[in-house]
């Protein structure tokens, strides 16, 4: 069994996974999943405790004596780890594949050697579980859903030991967020600080899960489209696989219209705003004023823009709005936006490029402030410089990315205020955005 994470896996976790792989090789009988994971995490805990708490001046015998005195501690740890592992599986944070995918660039020569040993054709031919499958099919990962699942030697496991959490899910009155319920779908007024359908490592704390429970449904609701975790507003959840496919088709055919209300830190011009977004699925999303071959067109239409008071300190505290250092926090600008293309972070990135970042947007506002203070810092902006070499340009891009901050923890000034499809035959609106909230 080989433990891995995504492409950013550390060599430490690969090494721990390889230790279990060797253990299974010595005793290649099928093992219950949670037993192996418990052993894996216990090994990690022992290594950590031994490394940080055993004095380095101890002789081997003294160290063994010290460890024997900590038996009670380790037993307590093992129980807690067992409970922790059950939670990880419940959260959907554990995956498996019959054959391990290619190791990451950080893998050592020894780790690569062991990987090759357990994925050699002569070894794979002996495994009954992958007969009739191509290597690519056998390397496909699946989420573990039961703690009593059995695995065999050579199985790949990916364990996300630090799932992204969404504590706000437990603070929401979910029934009050339901906008509409039909036989085919549910429309939800999604709270900010929550995930629509969950993340790679957490499908438990999601809008789909909590809305399903609030309505007492026996079949889980399904995600049809996404909005950012820090965005609130209208989301359509399908009640059946069939309608999920139907709604996806409507999105592809551009039959779904979305209106947003954005709270910007500066005024935004009325009309259509166009940029080009770098086709890399990684935040922050970089956009260019000018056309760049291969970059994706981003268009939105600002329908109106009006002055409103900047959210007061009480509202900011209630909704955990982050202070991103905007110089003047008295007047904000509420904009109604028709989203013409649906790119990830599109409104956030485009308005920041217009020197009007969203209130509370800790990712894009710092970069917008940096560009305002040092025009030309943005290598794709209005005041971009001419670079003499590709190396200089690459360094400028790296420096520009570093000007961006982290993803907001809870909320930004953005609401998906209306969603409609089939030429307005189905139209739904969210409640008042958080910044209009009256504090009792």
Predicted regions, residues:
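Short, low-complexity, Lys/Arg-enriched N-terminal segments of secretory-pathway carbohydrate enzymes
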Residues: 2-9, 13-16, 20-22
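Hydrophobic alpha-helical transmembrane segments
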Residues: 22-28
